[in-house]
Amino acid sequence: MQQIVLASGNKGKLAEFDQMLAAYGVKVLPQSQFNVSEVAETGTTFVENAIIKARHAAQITGHAAIADDSGLEVDLLQGVPGIYSARYAGENAKDQDNVLKLLDTLKDYPAPRTARFQCVLVYMRHAKDPTPIICQASWEGQIDFVQRGDNGHGYDPIFIPEHHDCSAAQMSSDEKNTLSHRGKALVQLITAMQEKGVFTDRNAQ
């Protein structure tokens, strides 16, 4: 089975990637399995940070790597928290800390509080890959006033997807994989990886 390292320690992301790539005979391994430390995200865009993370993981593990850089953009806040979504409430903030800070920041704003999740995925064959595969997708919606659901991570409990009445954390994993920014970007990435021959015939199901 082909192995690709995910340049993240986020268990929620690992589950999403592993579930969607399993059909292609690919096992997604967390970088923690190789004792890869988190790298400083010094970029000013999602693309830059994803490349930094993928290169770091590939260099240390010797495996091909996928990195995800994603975040939530709130229109009322001019795109904040953006690339700082994971550390919106501080460098060591947990998901709940970030959610509570955003709810507090928006408490005086009425609906609709439009927002979107952005996701950039980068696949690097090796650390010096000069032509990494880069895919981007978004998921439109708005920020709710309360948290709902527990089938998700990050800001999922307060994100109401466009044309839906439930939060992202109230959706089934299959539904979320179809609609979400990460799910859509991963479909793009899988297609691009197939076109470039990353998956061998015996991998594809």
Swiss-Prot record:
Textual note on the cofactor: Binds 1 Mg(2+) ion per subunit.
Gene Ontology biological process terms, A to Z: nucleoside triphosphate catabolic process; nucleotide metabolic process; purine nucleoside triphosphate catabolic process
Catalytic residues in the record: D69
Molecular function per GO: dITP diphosphatase activity; ITP diphosphatase activity; metal ion binding; nucleoside triphosphate diphosphatase activity; nucleotide binding; ribonucleoside triphosphate phosphatase activity; XTP diphosphatase activity
Domain of life, per lineage: Bacteria
Entry keyword annotation includes Membrane: no
Chain positions recorded as Mg(2+) binding sites: D69
tRNA processing listed as a keyword: no
Enzyme Commission (EC) number: 3.6.1.66
Cofactor(s) named in the record: Mg(2+)
Subunit composition and interactions: Homodimer.
Function: Pyrophosphatase that catalyzes the hydrolysis of nucleoside triphosphates to their monophosphate derivatives, with a high preference for the non-canonical purine nucleotides XTP (xanthosine triphosphate), dITP (deoxyinosine triphosphate) and ITP. Seems to function as a house-cleaning enzyme that removes non-canonical purine nucleotides from the nucleotide pool, thus preventing their incorporation into DNA/RNA and avoiding chromosomal lesions.
HAMAP family: Non_canon_purine_NTPase
The protein's name in its UniProt record: dITP/XTP pyrophosphatase
